[in-house]
Regions:
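Phosphate/NTP-binding elements of NTP-utilizing enzymes
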Residues: 1-151
């Protein structure tokens, strides 16, 4: 299956002066699509974003303020059960940690309890293990629930 989002329209929540930067949005989408699914029937297959996921990524990473920084640095997204929340959250966390160009970037996951928070960490760690480029550059500290990226 090789489908691509055909009719993307930038977010209606763009602040005055902000613009849509297709190259930055394309980079974020491409980074995530280099990762692999870690669970279920899709395990080991490339993470091909479906339309609603791609719209979220393009809105968050392609909407740029006049100073060149992303307009959105916080997002609240509601996703129903069994719709790939953990996979998408892990992919975004890896993008922010390893692919955003920020030196010594820190990404934190929050949840109601430690076990719940560890779900996204475990998915991210598995994505790292399945991606040769990241596996060479990311140290997984499982006991601390920590990933360290070495550019």
């Amino acid at each position: 299956m090789n489908r691509k989002l055909k009719d993307y329209t930038p977010t209606r929540f763009m602040a005055e002066g902000s613009t849509y930067n297709k190259a930055k949005a394309d980079y974020a989408v491409s980074f995530i699509e280099c990762l692999c699914h870690t669970k279920g029937i899709w395990a080991g297959k490339p993470f091909e974003l479906i339309d609603w996921q791609e719209r979220i990524i393009r809105d968050l990473f392609g909407t740029i303020k006049p100073n060149g920084y992303r307009q959105f640095n916080t997002a609240y997204i509601e996703i129903p059960k069994k719709q790939g929340k953990s996979e998408l959250a892990a992919a975004v966390a890896l993008l922010l940690c390893c692919g955003d160009g920020e030196e010594r970037a820190e990404v934190y996951g929050c949840a109601a309890d430690r076990q719940q928070a560890s779900i996204v960490f475990e998915v991210a760690a598995d994505m790292v293990r399945m991606c040769p480029a990241l596996n060479k550059r990311v140290k997984i500290l499982a006991s601390q629930k920590r990933l360290i990226f070495y550019p």
